[in-house]
């Protein structure tokens, strides 16, 4: 009797456990479905807010062109600085000789040597060396910093081979890429406005960076001088023009973003100097600071901007560049984790850490073509410490990456279209004239989806008639080789030869 009662009791308990288990399982399934529905709503809302149809992109391009004209009309007339670079002549391909470049823009700098052989041989030989800047020199003095640079430059010059020696009496010439804000006064002169990127040498602000470098070079006994002071965007334009004379503009799509282009000097009202012989002038747009009510920005863009070191500034750059796209994805995933069960019941602690998800991580996930999206899973585990994710979650993460990358690529295309539109008013026959846009930077170079989307969007904006006449070409290392090419283009010896032959 007792045994039967015990068996009955056990059966009842098992049945109760089964019922409870079934109820819990049903609740979990209902919760999972509710979470999936909420995730789908959030994704759809994101996609709608990031949508950039061609009609909207044309409005963005119109606004870009209008801001360009306003920036050219007067200093401070636009959010675009539209800086006159004093570069009025770009490499032709006929330059000959050996030229140097110094690329200083962060915690490392590079020195380059380029041997040019004219139109037939072009770049014969190219050497470069990268050097790390000790931390203490970033806040020491201009004298110590530039002396360190000059010592490295002198060692690099000393490594010239027999085939690199200059003719007797010839001075070495250097193109200087300085990627900090400067007020340029001539092609080879510019005063530092402020430091960025961990540099803090206060006494250097307001000084001529070229004069400081030339002085340090002389102290090393080097017979060398700076021929051209440029930034990486202008260098990319020079490198693009060197290989293709139809190059009209250059765009950098990397950690940051910028553009430069060739305009008619008489289309620059704020230019008060004598018109250059070429009739042209390269303009450094500083287009990252562009803003417009037509930009399809989301709450995530607004929050990122408000919490950035420069709120209200570089709004366009914050939607298209490598510094920020990965962070936008992180912010979106964090909101999804807070409002749904995308990553389970708890929010992954690392997901709350700003800038932990880089655009490099984003592009690796976005390029995952495996059937189970294993690369996405591995990245989420590696970067955010998320041990397990379902296929649905991985697909959602990929879709978020696609929404941000697509918007960024389409907005970058709109910026390029704005430049073409601005120049169109000076083109005799824009439908038949071939135009090349030189592009460099890690986002363009490595984020294949981004670059392809940007190019196809630009074609859509141009239309069937104009699209074949505009080409985007990747130009590698404009900040290095481009600077050396500008040194060659403005060589005192090249100028003398031109004068003799005229």
Curated annotation (Swiss-Prot):
Catalytic EC class: transferase
Pfam annotation, one family: Hexokinase_1
UniProt subcellular location: Plastid, Chloroplast outer membrane
Region feature (Hexokinase small subdomain): 92-230
Induction note: Not induced by glucose or fructose treatment in leaves.
Tissue: Expressed in roots, leaves, flowers, immature seeds, endosperm and seed coat.
Pathway: Carbohydrate metabolism; hexose metabolism; Carbohydrate degradation; glycolysis; D-glyceraldehyde 3-phosphate and glycerone phosphate from D-glucose: step 1/4
Binding of ADP, residues: 106-108, 255, 442
Transmembrane domains' residue ranges: 5-24
UniProt-listed GO biological process terms: glucose 6-phosphate metabolic process; glucose metabolic process; glycolytic process; intracellular glucose homeostasis
Molecular-function annotations in GO: ATP binding; D-glucose binding; fructokinase activity; glucokinase activity
Region ranges (Hexokinase large subdomain): 231-477
Entry protein name: Hexokinase-9
Lineage, opening ranks: Eukaryota, Viridiplantae, Streptophyta, Embryophyta, Tracheophyta
């Amino acid at each position: 009797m007792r045994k039967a009662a015990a068996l009955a009791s056990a059966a009842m308990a098992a049945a109760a456990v089964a019922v409870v288990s079934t109820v819990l399982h049903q609740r979990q399934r209902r919760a999972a479905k509710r979470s999936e529905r909420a995730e789908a709503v959030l994704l759809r809302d994101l996609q709608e807010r990031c949508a950039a149809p061609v009609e909207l992109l044309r409005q963005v391009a119109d606004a870009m062109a209008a801001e360009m004209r306003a920036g050219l009309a007067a200093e401070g007339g636009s959010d675009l600085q539209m800086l006159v670079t004093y570069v009025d002549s770009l490499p032709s391909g006929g330059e000959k000789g050996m030229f140097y470049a110094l690329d200083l823009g962060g915690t490392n700098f590079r020195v380059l040597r380029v041997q040019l052989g004219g139109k037939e041989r072009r770049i014969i030989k190219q050497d470069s060396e990268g050097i790390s800047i000790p931390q203490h020199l970033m806040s020491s003095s201009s004298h110590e910093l530039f002396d360190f640079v000059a010592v490295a430059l002198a060692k690099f010059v000393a490594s010239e081979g027999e085939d690199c020696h200059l003719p007797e009496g010839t001075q070495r010439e250097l193109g200087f890429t300085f990627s900090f804000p400067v007020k340029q006064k001539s092609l080879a002169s510019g005063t530092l406005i402020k430091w960025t990127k961990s540099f803090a040498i206060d006494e250097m602000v307001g000084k001529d960076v070229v004069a400081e470098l030339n002085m340090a070079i002389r102290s090393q006994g080097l017979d060398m001088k700076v021929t051209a002071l440029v930034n990486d965007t202008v260098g990319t334009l020079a490198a693009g023009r060197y290989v293709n004379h139809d190059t009209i503009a250059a765009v950098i799509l990397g950690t940051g973003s910028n553009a430069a282009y060739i305009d008619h000097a008489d289309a620059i009202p704020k230019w008060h100097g004598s018109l250059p012989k070429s009739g042209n002038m390269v303009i450094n747009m500083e287009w990252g600071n562009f803003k417009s009510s037509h930009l399809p920005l989301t709450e995530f863009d607004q929050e990122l901007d408000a919490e950035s070191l420069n709120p209200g500034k570089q709004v366009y750059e914050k939607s298209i560049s490598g510094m920020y796209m990965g962070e936008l994805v992180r912010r979106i995933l964090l909101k999804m984790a807070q409002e749904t069960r995308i990553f389970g019941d708890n929010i992954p602690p690392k997901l709350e850490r700003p800038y932990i998800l880089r655009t490099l991580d984003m592009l690796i996930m976005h390029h995952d073509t495996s059937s189970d999206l294993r690369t996405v899973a591995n990245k989420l585990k590696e970067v955010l410490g998320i041990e397990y994710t379902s296929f649905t979650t991985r697909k959602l993460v990929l879709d978020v990456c696609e929404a941000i990358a697509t918007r960024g690529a389409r907005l970058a295309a709109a910026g390029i279209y704005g430049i073409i539109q601005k120049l169109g008013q000076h083109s005799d026959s824009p439908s038949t004239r071939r135009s090349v846009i030189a592009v460099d930077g890690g986002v363009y170079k490595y984020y294949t989806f981004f670059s392809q989307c940007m190019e196809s969007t630009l074609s859509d904006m141009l239309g069937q008639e104009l699209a074949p006449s505009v080409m985007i070409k990747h130009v590698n290392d404009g900040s290095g080789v481009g600077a050396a090419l500008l040194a060659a283009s403005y060589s005192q010896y090249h100028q003398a030869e031109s004068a003799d032959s005229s």
